[in-house]
């Protein structure tokens, strides 16, 4: 049986790892063992952060909606409660976009939410 030499495959594997690790600092872009280790970590971080990105954007949208809602004298919590009571089904991504780009439309939604809110039981009688 013929002897199998792995030189070509090994070089191809090493070259692909080193090409993928271009841009890393120091030894991590030049030495195969360091590059392989860094590549493993990099792919792990990328996988983790693709999932974390969804929560990060949701936090950003909520912060933007809250800021715009407070400009209209209502908190984020009461605003969302009012929208649900009114049956308005606009997601947070679109609400945040409205808050940034179209303040008048957002103010209209705030008015709808305020109208749909139940009267506060603990509010002082006027």
Curated annotation (Swiss-Prot):
Entry's Gene Ontology BP terms: ribosomal large subunit assembly; translation
InterPro entries the UniProt entry points to: Ribosomal_bL20 (IPR005813), RIBOSOMAL_L20_CS (IPR049946), Ribosomal_protein_bL20_C (IPR035566)
Keywords recorded for this protein, A-Z: Ribonucleoprotein, Ribosomal protein, RNA-binding, rRNA-binding
Highest taxon of source: Bacteria
GO molecular function, one term: rRNA binding
Pfam families cross-referenced by the UniProt entry: Ribosomal_L20 (PF00453)
Record GO cellular component, one term: ribosome
Annotated disulfide bonds: none
Entry similarity comment: Belongs to the bacterial ribosomal protein bL20 family.
Free-text function comment from the UniProt entry: Binds directly to 23S ribosomal RNA and is necessary for the in vitro assembly process of the 50S ribosomal subunit. It is not involved in the protein synthesizing functions of that subunit.
Protein name (Swiss-Prot/TrEMBL): Large ribosomal subunit protein bL20
Organism listed in the record: Nocardia farcinica (strain IFM 10152)
Recorded name of the encoding gene: rplT
